[in-house]
């Protein structure tokens, strides 16, 4: 897969922010290709262990498939109701699955935690995973991607992310064709 120039720009901005500022958020409109951008970022970060968290099973499989197309040489694994495989350099899971005590205690130290649909991250299940993973590696970075950074319940994402590396609005996508 070849990224578009604007996607390459997002990748560069996000990697720079992760390396210099720590926890980083990418806000991009629906249709931008956030999964492709995120997969490229993970591949270029070259972390020993990355945990990729989704909120739905369909997204777990979709994100895993896209990741494997972009990064065919990076070993992946999945932790879900049927599989408990933590061996991959990139581990894909749902928040509801990983937040269970039995699954959390098997989690290896993570260097990069990626949260798809990051507006969900202020919920208890996500915070439980982040807090546990941070006890295993206090230097773990958290990268989030979302089209909608605002939550209806008023909880802020600022407790997790201290900066937003890039924002891509729908108007920009329309103008670029």
Model-identified regions with their sequence ranges:
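Conserved pre-motif I regulatory segment
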Residues: 1-27
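Hydrophobic residues on the short alpha-helix immediately C-terminal to a glycine-rich phosphate/catalytic loop
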Residues: 14, 37-45, 63, 129
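Conserved helix-turn-beta segment of the N-terminal RecA-like "Helicase ATP-binding" lobe
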Residues: 50, 58-82
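Conserved Walker B
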Residues: 95, 117-119
């Amino acid at each position: 897969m070849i990224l578009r120039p604007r996607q390459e720009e997002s990748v560069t901005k996000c990697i720079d922010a992760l390396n210099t500022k720590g926890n980083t958020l990418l806000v991009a409109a629906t249709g931008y290709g956030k999964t492709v951008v995120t997969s490229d970022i993970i591949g270029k970060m070259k972390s020993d262990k990355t945990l990729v968290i989704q909120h739905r099973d369909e997204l777990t499989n979709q994100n895993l498939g896209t990741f494997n197309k972009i990064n065919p040489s990076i070993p992946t694994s999945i932790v879900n109701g049927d599989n408990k495989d933590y061996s991959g350099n990139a581990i894909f899971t749902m928040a509801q699955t990983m937040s269970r005590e039995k699954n959390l205690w098997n989690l290896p130290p993570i260097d990069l935690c990626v949260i798809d649909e990051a507006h969900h991250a202020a919920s208890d299940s996500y915070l439980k995973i982040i807090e546990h993973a941070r006890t295993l590696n206090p230097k773990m970075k958290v990268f989030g991607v979302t089209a909608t950074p605002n939550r209806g319940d008023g909880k802020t994402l600022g407790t997790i992310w201290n900066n937003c590396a890039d924002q891509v609005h729908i108007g920009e996508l329309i103008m670029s064709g």
